[in-house]
């Protein structure tokens, strides 16, 4: 089996996650890392035994010829860096958001087609509670889907004050965490038809760790309303002003519901509310009858985002979450900002197909 060589654009703390995931995979080598500040690249290379480090990413691409590049640079650089990497012959996995505007996102999508390279964007929902939930999103268990709600809210990024700078980040909580809430909804319900949104900033001054004071120029409070195929409505919330992390999705059916919990507020990662028997343990939940704690799918390093990305490279196919779905997320968030500014709902035009075997009768 051919060894896949991986390079990293960005040496901040987010890169650690991907480096560690890659170390757990067979026949994968972390070959090089780039940072604008050479000392950051050197320190990260020493920490993880990465042989080469650079402060010129084009030189890194030319000299090390990686099979794939992980892009974790500031948001406003995602498009340029990703396109340059694909042009140089590398597949790309890019942190969220895909880009800071819809035009750049479309150019990234077109570049992946032009250069015939995989463009894998985040978010990544393929965790045990989500993949297990899909097995029960069937008419047999919950009836026809009637609505849904998804949320990712927390106090706000404690690091890197550029997150609060619109010129660099492109947007605030909408782009940073709204993409997660949206991704889970569209993975279940398919493409959004229309979006309406409210977006503002509630906290005009912030105190970062170390005592640094900043004045954000981005949104920290967002509520979105979506219309999906079949007339199903869903809502999403994305904020940076909650006192704690709230990260969950609920799918409501005519005769049941699915509670998917990604935070630590609930002892149960997944609860199925249904009158049908579920493989698992019957529990009491929210004072509802007929609730089940199902057995979750197993999760290995190969099931995580790096594992799926490497699998797609080896098999020359698109990953579970392909560029089309990432582009759709970018269009929805872009037009959510437009809706919040104009007070009018916005039509969504980008298509994609859900990656799981969804029943036609469910929606």
Model-predicted regions and their roles:
Residues 52-110:
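Beta-loop-alpha module in the N-terminal Rossmann-like domain of NAD(P)-dependent dehydrogenases
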Residues 54, 94, 119-120, 260:
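Hydrophobic residues in well-ordered beta-strands that form the structural core
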Residues 105-124, 143-148:
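Rossmann-fold dehydrogenase core element
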Residues 204, 208-209, 214-215, 223, ...:
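C-terminal glycine/acidic-rich active-site capping loop/insertion
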Residues 124-215, 343:
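Predominantly a Rossmann-like dinucleotide-binding segment in NAD(P)-dependent oxidoreductases
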Residues 1-48:
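N-terminal Rossmann-like dinucleotide-binding module
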Residues 50-51, 88-90, 114-117, 232-233:
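A short helix->loop->beta-strand "cap" motif at the edges of active sites that frequently abuts
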Residues 3, 23, 59, 68-71, ...:
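C-terminal helix-rich "cap/oligomerization" subdomain common to oxidoreductases
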């Amino acid at each position: 089996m051919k060894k896949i060589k991986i390079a990293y654009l960005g040496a901040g703390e987010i890169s650690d996650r991907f480096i560690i995931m890659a170390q757990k995979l067979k026949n994968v080598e972390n070959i090089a890392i780039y940072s604008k500040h050479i000392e950051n690249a050197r320190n990260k290379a020493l920490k993880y035994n990465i042989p080469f480090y650079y402060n010129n990413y084009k030189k890194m691409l030319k000299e090390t010829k990686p099979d794939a590049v992980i892009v974790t640079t500031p948001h406003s650089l995602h498009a340029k860096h990703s396109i340059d990497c694909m042009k140089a012959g590398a597949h790309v996995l890019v942190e969220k958001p895909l880009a800071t505007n819809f035009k750049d996102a479309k150019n990234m999508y077109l570049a992946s087609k032009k250069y015939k390279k995989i463009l894998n964007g985040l978010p990544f929902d393929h965790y045990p509670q989500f993949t297990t939930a899909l097995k029960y999103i069937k008419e047999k268990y919950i009836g026809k889907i009637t609505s849904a709600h998804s949320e990712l809210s927390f106090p706000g990024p404690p690091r890197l004050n550029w997150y609060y700078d619109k010129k660099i980040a492109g947007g605030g909580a909408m782009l940073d965490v709204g993409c997660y809430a949206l991704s889970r909804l569209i993975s279940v319900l398919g493409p959004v038809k229309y979006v309406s949104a409210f977006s503002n900033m509630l906290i005009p001054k912030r105190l970062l760790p170390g005592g640094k004071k900043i004045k954000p120029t981005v949104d920290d409070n967002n509520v979105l309303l979506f219309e999906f195929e079949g007339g199903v409505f869903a809502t999403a919330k994305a904020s940076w002003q909650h006192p704690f992390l709230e990260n969950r999705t609920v799918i409501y059916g005519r005769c049941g519901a699915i509670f998917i919990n990604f935070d630590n507020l609930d002892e149960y990662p997944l609860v199925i509310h249904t009158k049908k028997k579920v493989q698992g343990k019957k529990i009491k939940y929210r004072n509802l009858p007929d609730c089940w704690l199902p057995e979750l799918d197993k999760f290995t390093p190969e099931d995580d985002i790096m594992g799926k990305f490497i699998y797609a490279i080896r098999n020359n196919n698109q990953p579970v979450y392909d560029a089309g779905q990432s582009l759709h997320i970018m269009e929805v968030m872009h037009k959510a900002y437009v809706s919040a500014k104009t007070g009018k709902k916005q039509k969504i035009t980008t298509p994609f197909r859900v990656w799981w075997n969804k029943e036609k009768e469910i929606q």
